[in-house]
């Protein structure tokens, strides 16, 4: 049985050129801005998750990417996790370096690639479930045309359709010995004035973080809430 980590934040950051983010900050609030319906979506993953039952009886699809994670790490020791987002067709390793700019134009094998790879914020600690920071950030490129069938995190624009989010509510992050399930509870576009990459906001910073997420969130999720106790 998988324990659900209550927050992931699909945040699409438009202020950084060709740069997007996929961390999901969830919540259940009425917003003035309506989500944008993007036609022509083709949501499909590379493999079908297997269901597992939660204590409440809800069936949550679970995945196992430990073999893929181990293989990727054998090829590149900078590999720290495996990211699986079925709705965005993401099923790839996550790198991490001492500088966030290192993998900007390098793929997971360390070779030049215009669209880079997925990589974690250099200040995040990514190990076991218990070692995750309060706020984990994963970076990836996004094309300026916002094509929901485009490269890398450009596909996150599919999540601007509320119905699509309901059909694809989970994101998976595999770390050493554990396959984590995150539930999407918020969606919004932000600029870099919001410090959304702070690994461990505390006190007033933490309160401000969640209040900002609540204010920016576009979608309502019936029965799904988030709080300062959650990991994002």
Residue ranges and their predicted role:
Residues 1-14:
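N-terminal Sec-pathway targeting helices
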Residues 2, 19-20, 51:
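Low-complexity intrinsically disordered segments
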Residues 4, 22-25:
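Alpha-helical transmembrane segments in eukaryotic/viral proteins
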Residues 14-23:
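Bacterial N-terminal signal peptides
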Residues 24-232:
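Solvent-exposed, non-transmembrane regions of membrane-associated and secreted proteins
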């Amino acid at each position: 049985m998988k324990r659900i980590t209550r927050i992931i934040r699909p945040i699409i950051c438009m202020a950084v050129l060709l740069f997007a983010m996929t961390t999901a900050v969830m919540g259940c609030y009425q917003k003035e801005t309506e989500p944008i319906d993007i036609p022509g979506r083709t949501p499909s993953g590379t493999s079908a998750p297997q269901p597992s039952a939660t204590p409440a009886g809800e069936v949550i699809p679970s995945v196992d990417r430990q073999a893929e994670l181990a293989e990727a790490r054998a090829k590149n020791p900078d590999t720290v996790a495996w990211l699986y987002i079925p709705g965005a067709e993401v099923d790839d390793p996550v790198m991490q370096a001492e500088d966030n700019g290192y993998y900007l134009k390098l793929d997971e094998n360390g070779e030049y690639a215009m669209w880079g790879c997925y990589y974690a914020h250099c200040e995040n600690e990514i190990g076991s479930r218990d070692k995750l920071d309060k706020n984990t950030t994963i970076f990836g490129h996004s094309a300026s045309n916002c094509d929901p069938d485009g490269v890398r995190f450009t596909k996150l624009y599919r999540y601007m359709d509320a119905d699509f989010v309901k059909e694809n509510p989970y994101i998976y992050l595999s770390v050493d010995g554990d396959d984590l399930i995150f539930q999407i509870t918020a969606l919004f576009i932000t600029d870099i004035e919001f410090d959304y990459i702070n690994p461990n906001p505390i006190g007033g910073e933490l309160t401000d973080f969640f209040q900002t997420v609540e204010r920016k969130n576009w979608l309502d999720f019936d029965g799904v809430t988030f709080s300062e106790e959650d990991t994002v």
